[in-house]
Amino acid sequence: MPAEQRTALVTGGTGGLGEAIARALHDVGHTVLVVHSPGNASIGAWLEAQTDEGYNFIAYGADVADHASCQELAGLFQADCFLIEILVNNAGITRDATFRKLSYADWDAVLRVNLDSVFNVTRPFIDGMLERGWGRIVNIASINGSKGQF
């Protein structure tokens, strides 16, 4: 168990790597908030399955690619009395196409979710972390950031 229970936020926390990270943070005693895409129709079933396996997550829907949506999300956390102490920027998408076949819309979507989201989600919480003298920010990147498809 950690010396102190912290509040952790995991973007993209409802699938794959994000779910594994959320579970690991829960396993060491942290309160874990997960962010999923707005309108995710399966979030209720996902939360129920997690609860059945002993994981208690609190889920919020937000468009991490949208700055205003992330500001609203930060307001919800504040209203719900959560101070974000651990932030894992894990949200990411891919568009499975070679660069030559990639449309501008797909390019823009990938950059907004994979890159802009780091700023959008981190910005509302970094000042509080600095003021409290404690905080952790982990940024996850895809292999496509190092080895793209050309």
Question: Where on the chain are the PLM-derived regions?
Answer:
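Conserved NAD(P)H cofactor-binding loop of Rossmann-fold oxidoreductase domains
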Residues: N90-R95
